[in-house]
């Protein structure tokens, strides 16, 4: 006989009801009676119809998949309670397969429901193994989402201690507003449920239905991401036709929610340990990052660092500039002094020593002299017409127009030049009874 003492106290306090099913060779009557009394002590129903029953499902018929949904007792129990745990005691020689979701109606109500299936050969062995259930919170949890008949072996679902939960995809969308009480290490998506209807490209003509379907599918992806623990996996099963198109859309939405592609080695190890009997091919596997979106990372460094733009200097770091020049070495001086043009045949274009101004003054004086003595004559014959008709080097530039053959008289007076202490002539020209004064402009 199985004793209720193997149930940890904290396990019963967190469990609203326990459903025990097993082979006919196991006597569960006493355990069920103890479970009834303990459950009533832990949770007193407010009304009679809220009483949480714990039924004794003894016999091979309860090991058949088709017997669960048609059994009247199971339907009554399912309509009055919200189980958080379903424990199945299975002898080692039995083979139990929960295909379809016979327990779907019972497990779909709370998002934290779990299905535990243990193999035991004797009651004593069971008592020894069930002591490990006190560490239920640390056991890996796997959630399977499917709306159609799918072969999922609950008895052989894991080689290690794994809590396997099978839920309908629409259930997590209905409970999306509630905060998840349990986070899963892995979520296997076999089907997207009703949210996949009208979500493909064939329904884009109906804008209202298409938008509603895409919104439902986005809510489904958000609910899946909330149920996955940090570092957990999301397995997206492959398909064909419309299902494949929907799963590709789900993959894109899951990536939008923050999932990243998982490495093949990590996926193979997780599937081999916790989902060895999954026949569906995996189209894509995502992993939830361990970091949260929008969270600033703490930088490791000196907290007493100076703000940007502030340099921490020390007096010993200053260098005397005079020590950088060796007086014994000869350096090529940069720039030119006032006597630098003396060695050149012509003054520099940007001369600052005054040589250029002196040469220009001497050149003007030479032109005046040649003009007065008649050494220079017009080569073009247009000098008398004015500056508009004179050449660039015409000595008459700056003078008014005059008649051909008219004599032009120049009176020279000495004036001090503006730079270098040199003298420059200022000529006063009388022409047609008009006095013109040249103040050093080019002629």
Curated annotation (Swiss-Prot):
- A GO MF label: metal ion binding
Provide the assembly information.
Monomer.
Placement of sequence motif Cx2C motif 2: 391-394
Q: Where in the cell is it found?
A: Cytoplasm; Mitochondrion intermembrane space
Q: Coiled-coil regions in this chain? A: none
The species this protein was found in: Toxoplasma gondii (strain ATCC 50861 / VEG)
> Motif Cx2C motif 1 at which residues?
380-383
Domains: entry comment: The C-terminal domain binds 2 Fe-S clusters but is otherwise mostly in an intrinsically disordered conformation. The N-terminal domain has structural similarity with S-adenosyl-L-methionine-dependent methyltransferases, but does not bind S-adenosyl-L-methionine. It is required for correct assembly of the 2 Fe-S clusters.
Region ranges (N-terminal SAM-like domain): 136-301
Q: Region Fe-S binding site B: what ranges? A: 380-394
**Which PANTHER family does the protein's record reference?**
ANAMORSIN
Q: Which residues cross the membrane?
A: none
Q: Which domain of life is it from?
A: Eukaryota
Q: What does this protein do?
A: Component of the cytosolic iron-sulfur (Fe-S) protein assembly (CIA) machinery. Required for the maturation of extramitochondrial Fe-S proteins. Part of an electron transfer chain functioning in an early step of cytosolic Fe-S biogenesis, facilitating the de novo assembly of a [4Fe-4S] cluster on the cytosolic Fe-S scaffold complex. Electrons are transferred from NADPH via a FAD- and FMN-containing diflavin oxidoreductase.
Residues noted as binding [4Fe-4S] cluster in the record, renumbered to the chain: 380, 383, 391, 394
Q: What is stated as this protein's family in its record? A: Belongs to the anamorsin family.
Instruction: Write the record's keywords in alphabetical order, separated by commas.
Output: 2Fe-2S, 4Fe-4S, Cytoplasm, Iron, Iron-sulfur, Metal-binding, Mitochondrion
GO BP, sorted A to Z: iron-sulfur cluster assembly
Residues recorded as binding [2Fe-2S] cluster, renumbered to this chain, are 341, 348, 351, 353
Q: This chain belongs to which protein, by name?
A: Anamorsin homolog
Q: What is the lineage of its organism?
A: Eukaryota, Sar, Alveolata, Apicomplexa, Conoidasida
Keyword check for Metal-binding: yes
Q: Which GO terms describe its cellular component?
A: mitochondrial intermembrane space
Q: Which cofactor does it need?
A: [2Fe-2S] cluster; [4Fe-4S] cluster
Region described as Linker: spans on this chain: 302-331
Where is the segment annotated Fe-S binding site A? 341-353
The record's disulfide annotation reads none
């Amino acid at each position: 006989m199985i004793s209720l003492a193997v149930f940890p106290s904290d396990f019963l306090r967190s469990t609203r009801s326990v459903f025990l099913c097993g082979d006919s060779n196991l006597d569960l009557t006493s355990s069920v009676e103890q479970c009834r009394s303990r459950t009533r002590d832990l949770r007193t129903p407010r009304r009679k119809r809220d009483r949480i029953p714990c039924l004794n499902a003894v016999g091979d018929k309860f090991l058949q998949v088709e017997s669960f949904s048609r059994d009247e007792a199971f339907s009554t129990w399912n309509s009055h309670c919200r189980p958080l745990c379903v424990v199945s005691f299975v002898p080692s020689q039995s083979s139990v397969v929960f295909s379809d979701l016979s327990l779907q109606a019972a497990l779909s109500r709370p998002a934290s429901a779990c299905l535990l299936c243990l193999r035991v050969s004797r009651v004593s062995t069971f008592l020894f193994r069930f002591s490990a259930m006190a560490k239920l919170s640390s056991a890996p949890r796997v959630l399977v989402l499917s709306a159609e008949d799918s072969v999922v072996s609950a008895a052989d679902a894991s080689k290690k201690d794994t809590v396997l939960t099978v839920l309908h995809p629409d259930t997590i969308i209905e409970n999306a507003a509630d905060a998840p009480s349990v986070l899963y290490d892995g979520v296997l998506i076999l089907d997207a449920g009703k949210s996949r209807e009208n979500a493909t490209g064939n329904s884009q003509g109906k804008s209202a239905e298409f938008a509603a379907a895409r919104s439902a599918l986005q809510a489904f992806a958000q609910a899946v991401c909330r149920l996955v623990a940090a570092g957990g996996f999301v397995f997206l099963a492959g398909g064909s036709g419309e299902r494949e198109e929907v799963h590709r859309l789900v993959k894109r939405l899951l990536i939008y929610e923050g999932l990243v592609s998982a490495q093949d080695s990590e996926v193979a190890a997780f599937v081999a340990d916790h989902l060895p009997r999954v026949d569906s091919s995996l189209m894509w596997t995502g992993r939830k990052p361990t970091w949260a979106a929008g969270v600033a990372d703490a930088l490791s460094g000196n907290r007493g660092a100076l703000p940007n733009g502030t340099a921490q200097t020390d007096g010993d770091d200053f260098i005397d500039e005079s020590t950088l020049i060796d007086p014994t070495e000869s350096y090529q001086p940069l720039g030119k002094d006032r006597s630098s043009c003396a060695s050149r045949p012509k003054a520099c274009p940007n001369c600052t020593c005054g040589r250029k101004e002196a040469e220009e003054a001497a050149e003007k004086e030479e032109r005046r002299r040649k003009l007065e003595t008649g050494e220079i004559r017009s080569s073009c014959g247009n000098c008398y017409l004015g500056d508009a008709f004179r050449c660039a080097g015409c000595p008459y530039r700056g003078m008014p127009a005059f008649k051909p053959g008219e004599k032009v008289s120049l009176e020279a007076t000495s004036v001090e030049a503006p730079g270098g202490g040199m003298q420059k002539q200022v000529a006063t020209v009388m022409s047609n009874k008009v006095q013109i004064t040249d103040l050093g402009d080019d002629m």
